[in-house]
């Protein structure tokens, strides 16, 4: 967010849609009730949402049996619920869980030994991009090589549909986090600076993300352009840290030391 805002004043939110998912935005310190700094109420402060942990109590998000299995088999069961349903680290595994279920029910790869399919995290999210982006024989050949099975054309088309559904749900969930910030802050336009492999490399993520945002924020269907759009923020963490360091040094020179630990 800070890295992008340095060059783009229309930046309203910074987001990561990659191995994990998260977002940050600027809030007035007067709205942060537990904060006591002596700063003017309108002073802006960056808020790190950490919404990858949203609904760890499992009371809101409708989880499938595949989501539940991934959570229970993870190193930290019951944590990062939202992230496990939408982030790049898990989308490929959700796809694998679905296909493994189909195999166990005798729906795909009939009569074949599919031990590779049973390997956890054997399929990464990047392969879902391949399935969606390449409708031809090359993608099917790669699928066969990955799982060491023969894939019929019907099975290949099914796998493409599953990949599409998993990736679409992930993109729409990612939209929910950003749209919640927009609604809370009354944001009607601006740029969401996004970094991460899913945002930058999945061929259909941005389109699906934008469609969902329009639905949630009730944009008119006949709009000429989207009021809120994704912009690229590659290496935002590194550049942003440098910008924040420079800003902090300037604050110290100006005698503003709230929130700065004295050494």
Language-model features and meaning:
Residues 38-80:
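E2/UBC-UEV (E2-variant) core
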């Amino acid at each position: 967010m800070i890295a992008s805002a340095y060059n783009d004043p229309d930046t309203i939110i910074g987001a990561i849609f990659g191995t994990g998912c998260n977002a940050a935005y600027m809030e007035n310190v007067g709205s942060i009730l537990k904060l006591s700094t002596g700063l003017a109420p309108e002073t802006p402060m960056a808020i790190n949402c950490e919404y990858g942990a949203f609904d760890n109590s499992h009371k809101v998000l409708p989880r499938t049996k595949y989501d539940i299995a991934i959570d229970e088999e993870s190193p930290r069961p019951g944590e990062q619920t939202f992230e496990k349903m939408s982030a790049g680290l898990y989308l490929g595994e959700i796809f694998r869980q679905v296909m493994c279920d189909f195999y166990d029910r005798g729906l795909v790869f009939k009569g074949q030994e599919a031990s590779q399919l049973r390997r956890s995290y054997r399929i990464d999210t990047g392969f879902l991009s391949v399935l969606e982006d390449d409708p031809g024989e090359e993608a099917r050949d790669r699928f066969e090589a990955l799982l060491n099975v023969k894939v019929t054309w019907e099975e290949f088309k099914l796998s493409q549909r599953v990949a599409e559904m998993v990736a679409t749900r992930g993109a729409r969930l990612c939209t929910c986090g950003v749209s919640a910030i927009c609604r809370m802050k009354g944001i009607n336009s601006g740029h969401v600076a996004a970094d991460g492999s899913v945002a930058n490399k999945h061929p259909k993520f941005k389109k699906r993300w934008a469609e969902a945002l329009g639905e949630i924020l009730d944009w008119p269907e006949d709009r000429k352009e989207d009021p809120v759009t994704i912009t690229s923020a590659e290496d935002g963490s590194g550049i942003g840290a440098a910008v924040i360091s420079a800003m902090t040094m300037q604050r110290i020179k100006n005698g503003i030391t709230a929130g700065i630990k004295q050494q």
